[in-house]
């Protein structure tokens, strides 16, 4: 909806003013929060705060161009979006929580869903079926989930859900045995904030370890410096079962048997 209403701009035209070659939004976040906390403390809104916030964003990220030249052509953000011929309505967001009806649209109650989008709620086995079908047919997957807990090994480049939570990584001499993940485990982890929507990544393939355990090959956004697999991670199937909050795929990537259930 944001793209359809506002358009899109190439990164080389609007790069968000990266500082020292990379983005660092911490200062911007603190400035915005301080400003908005001050606005709220006044208890009565004036007509100035919106403009002040917009100017702050412009100072840190740059002004959004009304028109720009790209590859020898002139565009507005809206006309460039039209040129790309991307239809946002062709993409479907799926989630999986058993406290809500399956095969129905739900409003996923997470901070990142500030646009109040609807997600199609399916069993977790369907999430995996959608992912596998997408990858086997040349589609990638936008993954929304949790990467902030103990078993997302940042230096080693992989993520698992080991049976033995206490075993130290350095003590392991072979691949970990992993927990069998259930629907009840998923909703318990979500409701207890053990799983949050703290990160988004791009799943582009699969792999297996020496024991035949399936892993999803995942492009991260943390750069390549000091990363074992050049910015990619391997998430085990058990990790994906437990830690996935939602996925987004093109409608043509969804198995027909599941697509037919979408109302």
Model segments located where?
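Active-site signature of cysteine proteases
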Residues: 53-263
């Amino acid at each position: 909806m944001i793209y359809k209403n506002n358009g899109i701009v190439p990164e080389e035209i609007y790069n968000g003013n990266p500082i020292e070659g990379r983005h660092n939004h911490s200062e911007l976040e603190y400035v915005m929060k301080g400003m908005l906390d001050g606005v709220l403390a006044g208890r009565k809104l004036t007509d100035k705060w919106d403009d002040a916030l917009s100017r702050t964003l412009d100072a840190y990220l740059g002004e959004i161009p009304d028109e720009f030249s790209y590859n020898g052509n002139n565009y507005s953000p809206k006309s460039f979006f039209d040129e790309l011929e991307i239809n946002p309505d062709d993409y479907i967001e799926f989630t999986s929580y058993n406290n809500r009806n399956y095969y129905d649209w739900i409003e996923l109650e997470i901070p990142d869903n500030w646009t109040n989008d609807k997600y199609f709620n399916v069993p977790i086995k369907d999430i995996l079926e959608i992912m596998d079908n997408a990858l086997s047919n040349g589609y990638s997957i936008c993954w929304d989930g949790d990467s902030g807990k103990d078993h997302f090994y940042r230096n080693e480049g992989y993520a698992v859900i080991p049976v033995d939570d206490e075993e130290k990584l350095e003590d392991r001499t072979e691949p970990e045995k992993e927990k069998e993940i259930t629907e009840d485990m998923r909703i318990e982890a979500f409701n207890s904030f053990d799983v949050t929507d703290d990160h988004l990544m791009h799943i582009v393939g699969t792999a297996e370890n020496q024991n035949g355990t399936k892993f999803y090959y995942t492009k991260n956004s943390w750069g390549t410096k000091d990363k074992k697999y050049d910015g990619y991670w391997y998430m085990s199937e058990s990790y994906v079962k437990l830690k996935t909050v939602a996925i987004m795929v093109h409608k043509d990537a969804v198995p027909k048997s599941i697509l037919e259930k979408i109302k």
